[in-house]
C-alpha cells in the first residue's frame, strides 16, 4: 500500500512538472509571437473606429441643438477601402497568434499603447469596447476571460 501511495505521488508530481513546463513554454512562445507580429494595423483600425464614433456623436449633438446645417461627413470609397484593409490585416495578424491567451495579450498591448493617447475616460471606454469587439469582428468569437484593460479592477 505504501508503494502504491508513493507511486501515485510520483505520478502526480510528474504531471504537475510537465503541466508547469508546458505552461511556461506556451507563455514564452506567446511572448515571441507578440514580438514578431505587427499590431500597427489593429491600432490604426481601432483609432479610426474611435474617431468615427466621436464625429457621429458631435454631429448628433449639433442636430439636437437645432443646428440644421450640419456639415455631413462623407467618407470616400477610398477611405472605406483603407479601413477595410486595416481591419483585414489586423485580423490576419491576430489570427497568427496560436492561442486565445496570446490574442488577449495582444489586445492588452494595444490597449496599453492606445490608452496613453486617449483624452478622457470616455475615449478609454470606447477603446476598451472596440478592442472587446475586435475578435468577433475578425470572426473568431469573443475571447473568454480576457480583460483588455489589465489595470482595471
UniProtKB/Swiss-Prot annotation:
Tell me the protein family, please: Belongs to the 2S seed storage albumins family.
**Gene Ontology molecular function terms on file:** nutrient reservoir activity
Q: Which UniProt keywords apply?
A: Allergen, Disulfide bond, Endoplasmic reticulum, Signal
**Protein name as catalogued:** Conglutin delta 2
Question: Tell me, how does this one assemble?
Answer: Heterodimer of a small chain and a large chain; disulfide-linked.
Q: What GO cellular component is one of the record's annotations?
A: endoplasmic reticulum
List locations, semicolon-separated.
Answer: Endoplasmic reticulum
Give the matching InterPro entries: Bifun_inhib/LTP/seed_sf (IPR036312), Bifunc_inhib/LTP/seed_store (IPR016140), Napin/2SS/CON (IPR000617)
